[in-house]
């Protein structure tokens, strides 16, 4: 099968990483993989793996740029004999939709998160099939954009178990610190103030606790606000803001507990399955896609999104009861192996491609039969 994925850019990020990994997997399995984007740091990794990349300004919203990109994409689709087009963002999806109409090549979309009820957002539901990363996204696509469930396919994000793997902390030859951490962009929805307020309570019970916050800040003032809050809570000596890091598996493996205290609806919660793969116990809020991953008191602990006291108590439970923490971590690891293994997600995606192509074949057969009858 010849597959073309289209997305705005190939810089670092979860969507970009998933695109590259899927393209490499398709290539390895004997399929043709083509990626169209405006370029970025990950292009070299693609081309080194034998994946064809075309640079187009598919991140620009200008109507003239969109028209140019539609024409160029049609030429690429024909040149590469593409069987299915897979769009992963709104402007690329708009371009892919018109190219699909002109070339009669099926087009599918992946909804990685929530979209505002903007007119442009409707395009994410125009795919012949619509892939969603969690049940809550699927529900939103139905309720907000009228996408029928019969066209929605649930494929959660996967995790590379060769990269995120069990690493016994004692075997790393380092002093074992008690570390509670968060990983994710420094944005209000992630619940960083809630986390810091909870950790101030934890620190009163465990004064030597260490806190690590890993992630970049799209808006610098917000990071400064969090640093000020940490100082006001008396956590300056305990907390580290580590920024963007590329050694996440190693850092995550050193955590005693991962906190995922989102205060808004998370589309999925990739860091939770990464923690599960590493055998790290998890405390998360009962929000959005997080409940698709964690079964309370089986795979981890779920808490309300508005109470630092309850969050602190949950973290302390896992720190003070290592047997319980390990039981939850082992259960989550098994779930990740069973439901979120990256190759399994890729195979499910390939099945969606095959379904989209087969629907086109059925339509062609029906039209041919109709023409014959006249």
Feature-to-residue mapping (PLM):
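Glycosyltransferase donor-sugar binding loop
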Residues: 35-41, 183, 210-224
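A conserved, positively charged/aromatic
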Residues: 101-135, 139, 146-147
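Acidic anion/phosphate-binding donor-loop and adjacent secondary structure
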Residues: 61-65, 139-144, 150-151, 158-175, ...
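A conserved mid-protein helix/loop that constitutes part of the nucleotide-sugar donor-binding site
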Residues: 13-21, 182-204, 221-224, 309-310, ...
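Active-site donor-binding acidic/aromatic loop of nucleotide-activated sugar
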Residues: 219-225, 236-245, 251, 301-302
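Acidic donor-binding loop of glycosyltransferase active sites
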Residues: 238, 253-267, 280
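Conserved acidic donor-binding segment of nucleotide-sugar-dependent glycosyltransferases
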Residues: 296-297, 301-308, 317-323
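Short hydrophobic beta-strand element within catalytic cores of glycosyltransferases
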Residues: 35, 281-284, 294
């Amino acid at each position: 099968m010849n597959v073309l994925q289209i997305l705005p850019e190939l810089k670092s990020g979860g969507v970009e990483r998933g695109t590259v990994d899927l393209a490499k997997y398709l290539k390895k399995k004997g399929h043709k993989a083509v990626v169209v984007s405006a370029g970025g740091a990950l292009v070299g990794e693609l081309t080194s793996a034998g994946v064809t990349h075309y640079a187009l300004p598919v991140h620009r919203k200008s109507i003239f740029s969109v028209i140019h990109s539609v024409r160029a994409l049609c030429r690429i689709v024909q040149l590469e004999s593409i069987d299915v087009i897979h769009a992963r963002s709104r402007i690329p999806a708009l371009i892919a939709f018109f190219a699909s109409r002109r070339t009669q090549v099926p087009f599918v979309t992946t909804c990685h998160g929530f979209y505002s009820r903007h007119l442009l957002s409707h395009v994410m539901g125009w795919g012949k099939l619509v892939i969603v990363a969690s049940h809550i996204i699927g529900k939103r696509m139905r309720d907000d954009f009228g996408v029928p469930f019969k066209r929605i396919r649930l494929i959660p994000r996967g995790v590379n178990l060769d990269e995120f793997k069990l690493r016994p902390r004692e075997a790393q030859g380092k002093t074992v610190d008690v570390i509670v951490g968060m990983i994710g962009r420094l944005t209000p929805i992630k619940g960083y103030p809630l986390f810091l307020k909870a950790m101030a309570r934890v620190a009163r019970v465990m004064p030597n606790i260490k806190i690590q916050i890993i992630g970049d800040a799209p808006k610098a003032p917000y990071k400064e606000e969090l640093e000020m809050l940490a100082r006001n809570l008396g956590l300056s000596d305990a907390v580290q803001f580590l920024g963007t890091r590329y050694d996440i598996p190693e850092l995550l493996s050193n955590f005693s507990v991962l906190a995922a205290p989102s205060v808004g609806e998370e589309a999925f919660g990739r860091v939770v399955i990464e923690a599960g793969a590493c055998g790290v116990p998890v405390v998360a809020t009962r929000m959005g896609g997080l409940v698709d991953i964690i079964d309370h008191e089986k795979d981890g602990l779920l808490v309300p999104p508005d109470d630092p006291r309850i969050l602190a108590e949950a973290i302390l439970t896992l720190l003070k009861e290592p047997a319980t923490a390990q039981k939850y971590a082992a259960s989550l690891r098994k779930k990740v192996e069973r439901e979120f293994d990256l190759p399994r997600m890729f195979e499910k995606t390939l099945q969606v491609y095959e379904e989209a192509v087969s629907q086109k074949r059925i339509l062609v057969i029906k039209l041919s039969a109709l023409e014959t009858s006249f």
